[in-house]
Amino acid sequence: LEAEGVIGGGDLARMKEEAEALVAEEARAVIEAPWPEPHRAGENVLAKEPRRIRIEPLEPSTRGQAAANLPPVETGPPFDAKGKTFLEAVTMGVADALSADPRVFVFGEDVGGKYGNAFLLLRPLLAQCADRIINSPLAEGAVLGVCVGAALAGQRPIGEMQFNDFVATGFNQLVNNAAKIRYRWGESVPMVVRMPWGGLRHAGPYHSQNTEAWFYRTPGLKIVVPSTPYDARALLASAVADPDPVLYYEHIALYRDPRVKQVLAAEAPAPIRIGKAALRRRGSALAIVSYGAYVHVAMRVAGKLAKDGIEAAVLDLRSLAPLDRDALLALALQCGRVLIVHEDTRTGSVGESLAAIIQEEAFEYLDAPVRIVGSLDTPVPYSPPLEEAFLPSEEEVEKAARLLLAY
């Protein structure tokens, strides 16, 4: 730098001396500062949340306290063959965000140019928003790192993983940077990561995984999993407005499913609070808890049971983190039998965590063991007959429900 005339003689030594003095001053301030009060260990993980504490479910004051918190039935707009697909709803949600806030931009692989992402989801937006739908290198760590930096700089990035499987190469940016920055030094990281996910499409082990459990146990990340077009659009609005990093899981098998279409208004919907489950069907004989594409499997099974005079409730979690524990426990207390259904493999899954919560906090109200139906503990097979054997079928879910009812 001296040879090029960028800095003068002695500048380097002076800058080094100034830097060392600054570090020494800050280090001295930290050393002299008092230790924080122990109760602060549970603070500042997410914005606007109560201090996190350990729950002791055996305390008399906490047992059965969620019994009165059963949410109302929330079906959303009826399914309509003339309505919008799940994919179109996500497109509308991105359009809502881009039009409402100039700080919003989309960043990901093949999202811009003339392509509009691997599913052409963003193509309708390119004509008006080409300068804010930006192609990234083929590097998921770079996508997520740019989003973290942009969020810290005051922007509202919507990052895209072309398939949620690919997030593995950007793991550090999510779990060690985005998730921990608020807890470490109090800064907000308002970013959304769109995560196309799931099987049911014969796409093999690198384009079909369920990665939500990877992040479910990471404090500092929020996770939403809409199951309907209406919720997809409304939850995306909530995610973009949120001050914390949000993983937005959109199930690929729902994208163009003709059975899952809803008429959506031209104007943006009211946001849905992240962390609020939806009771899709009321019942008292059995509670079926699910999220994502398998909510629709749960609804079909509940419909079959109803033909035999058995009324099963269906709870659509919508958010995994934060989790609507009150709705989950209230339904367990009301029904006494709980069937958890998801596409993910069983071991270490969200379902196992839900079962543990119910067993610990509602044990006295249960009439049967909590049952979990998930995929086999294998990678996702590519071959159609193998994938069909890997995934939990509607028939398996119905069988599990009837066995639970007969217990």
Language-model features, listed with the residues they occupy:
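Thiamine diphosphate
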Residues: 1-37, 43, 49, 53-249, 253-254, ...
